[in-house]
């Protein structure tokens, strides 16, 4: 349970072996590649260059096509019959890189693209027909072909008038102008009236002038033949045909949904190919050779050595120099108990390569503190069930895998603390028993202590736990400083406070006094004064003295007081649960009590789950890590097979 030692790996190999070697390094999954840092002035390196071609860009474009097609099929696929949480397929590495899968996926992309294009074309034509139908509907009352044209003596005008114009006023205005004019009213739509005006050509200008006062606008029916009714009938016939074609297209898309698995496998395979291409761009290449540089865990160096022995390659693995530590990637080596705490470390910042792995040191505190704040058997069971479900059903990886493990560990802690405080959804069970049987003697679950009656004891215990964790952090700091050869810093920094705390404890019990004075405490105070001013000079000693006393005392004791939140969250969760149980009990019925209590406790559970995690995280990152943690590390990211949709199993 520590930070894994790294070796800097350098490889010279034949260019013809480069692709195969990268594939096998990806299979091993233990080498992180980096861009070589060789001096460009060295003539021996003039033939080596970093090469970048369009292969990576083309692969990324193909990946986008596969992903787009997969999303389209997800939208078009029928209800998943495998359930809401289908298991991820398990395939071998050979099946992942099977060329046939890629061909099947590419054919699916082409078919889906063609079907999507056809569907879009059908939808566009449907929208066009809808617009045409809406335009023709107001003319249904006119039994005159829309392609009726003017003749030598008769002027034919299709158009619209303002909806405010009355029939009598329009006809009277035309009659005053000429007797050689007739109006046929087709219909109304919105604020317009649709009309057909027939008049003698000699009276055409006069008729137009009369109609202008009523907002007349001419309408053209280019391309339309026959009456509005006949055209709408044709449109409806075409719409029925298009609807059938659209349904057939959607049915074919739904059938293509059966190829989602092939697309997912292909996406995972393309992800690995792109990773190798990105790694390849970090190499230096000449016409016949290549140079590779990276990091490998010392414990896995033998695997890399065995692989390289199969190729015509020269290589070396060296320990990093201290000035290289900031560039060395960090890999944490933890067991099943402490590995889920990577979720906390990832959210904060990785330790430096020459630092210390915080997970095993933090695990007992984080898990116990979380359970102490939640402290409910039902909540613990829910967390435990959720973590087990995620692991067995979803089989997550990365952060989600750590979350599942953390839910299990914190769920166990929450259940245990809930058993000690006698809490199961607060006081749900005793209140339910009282509603069912008012004369019951079951008034509470057995408890070692309860948040409402033992608040002061819990507060003292919280502060004691805080003191224990702070002292643990100080002890780790002492060990690190002694290992680094700065034992004087350990003496004046941590040793001072240990002397003060020991002196206070001895003074309280009356031990270690000399002439009525607490000697150990006085020694600690003198160490505080000297240690804080030992590097200052002149007037700076006074300011350093004031700063040391003020910042040291307030900082140390404020850190301890921060742990009062353990009691506060335990008390808050317990009170909220009991309040909802009381509200449910007021209903007077078992059903009402159960519904109100469960809804309220569900809300309390979700709020506490987030609140306890955030406050626990704060205690670890500020109060605990602040004592010893050296940050600045970069997580180890090797070239490996990392899949999203499938799980890789061993070859038979």
Segments from the language model and where they lie:
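Conserved, carboxylate-rich catalytic/transport cores that coordinate ions
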Residues: 2-8, 16-22, 26-33, 302-652
């Amino acid at each position: 349970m520590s930070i894994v030692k790294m070796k800097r790996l350098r490889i010279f190999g034949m260019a013809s072996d480069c692709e195969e070697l990268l594939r096998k390094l990806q299979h091993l999954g233990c080498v992180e590649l980096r861009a070589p840092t060789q001096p460009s002035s060295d003539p021996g390196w003039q033939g080596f260059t970093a090469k970048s071609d369009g292969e990576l860009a083309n692969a990324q474009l193909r990946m986008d096509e596969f992903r787009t097609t997969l999303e389209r099929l997800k939208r078009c696929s029928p209800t998943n019959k495998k359930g809401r949480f289908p298991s991820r397929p398990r395939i071998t590495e050979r099946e992942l890189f099977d060329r046939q899968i890629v061909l099947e996926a590419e054919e699916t992309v082409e078919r889906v693209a063609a079907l999507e294009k056809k569907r879009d074309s059908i939808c566009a034509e449907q929208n066009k027909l809808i617009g045409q139908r809406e335009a023709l509907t107001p003319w249904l009352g006119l039994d005159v072909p829309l392609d009726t044209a003017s003749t030598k003596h008769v002027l034919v005008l299709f158009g619209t008038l303002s909806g405010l114009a009355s029939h009598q006023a329009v006809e009277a205005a035309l009659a005053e102008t000429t007797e050689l004019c007739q109006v046929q009213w087709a219909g109304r739509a919105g604020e317009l009236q649709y009309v057909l005006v027939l008049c003698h050509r000699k009276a055409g200008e006069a008729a137009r002038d009369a109609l202008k006062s009523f907002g007349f606008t001419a309408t053209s029916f280019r391309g339309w033949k026959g009456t509005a009714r006949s055209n709408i009938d044709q449109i409806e016939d075409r719409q029925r045909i298009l609807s059938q074609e659209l349904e057939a297209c959607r049915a074919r898309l739904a059938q293509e949904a059966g190829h989602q698995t092939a697309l997912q496998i292909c996406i995972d395979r393309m992800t690995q190919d792109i990773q190798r291409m990105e790694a390849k761009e970090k190499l230096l290449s000449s016409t016949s050779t290549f140079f590779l540089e990276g990091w490998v865990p010392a414990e896995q160096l033998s695997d890399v050595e065995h692989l390289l022995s199969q190729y015509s390659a020269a290589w070396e693995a060296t320990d990093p120099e201290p000035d290289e530590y900031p560039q060395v990637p960090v890999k944490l080596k933890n067991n099943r108990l402490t590995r889920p705490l990577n979720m906390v470390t990832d959210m904060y910042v990785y330790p430096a390569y020459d630092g210390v792995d915080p997970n095993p040191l933090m695990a007992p505190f984080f898990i116990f503190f979380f359970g102490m704040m939640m402290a409910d058997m039902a909540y613990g069971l829910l967390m435990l069930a959720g973590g087990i479900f995620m692991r067995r059903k979803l089989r997550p990886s990365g952060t989600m895998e750590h979350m599942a493990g953390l839910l299990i560990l914190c769920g166990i802690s929450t259940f245990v603390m809930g058993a000690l405080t006698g809490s199961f959804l607060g006081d749900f069970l005793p209140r339910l028993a009282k509603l069912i049987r008012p004369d019951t003697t079951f008034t509470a679950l057995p408890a070692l202590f309860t948040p409402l009656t033992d608040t002061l004891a819990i507060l003292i215990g919280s502060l004691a736990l805080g003191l224990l964790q702070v002292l643990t952090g100080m002890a780790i700091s002492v060990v690190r400083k002694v290992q680094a050869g700065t034992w004087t810093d350990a003496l004046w920094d941590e040793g001072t406070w240990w002397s003060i705390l020991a002196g206070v404890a001895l003074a309280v019990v009356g031990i270690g006094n000399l002439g009525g004075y607490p000697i150990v405490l006085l020694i600690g105070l003198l160490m505080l004064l000297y240690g804080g001013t030992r590097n200052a000079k002149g007037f700076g000693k006074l300011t350093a003295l004031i700063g040391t006393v003020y910042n040291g005392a307030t900082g140390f004791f404020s850190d301890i007081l921060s742990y009062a939140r353990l009691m506060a969250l335990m008390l808050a969760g317990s009170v909220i649960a009991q309040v909802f149980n009381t509200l449910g009990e007021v209903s007077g019925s078992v059903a009402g009590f159960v519904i109100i209590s469960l809804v309220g406790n569900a809300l309390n559970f979700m709020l506490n789950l987030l609140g306890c995690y955030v406050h626990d995280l704060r205690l670890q990152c500020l109060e605990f890590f602040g004592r010893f943690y050296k940050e600045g590390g970069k997580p180890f990211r090797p070239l490996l097979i990392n899949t999203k949709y499938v799980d890789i199993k061993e070859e038979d």
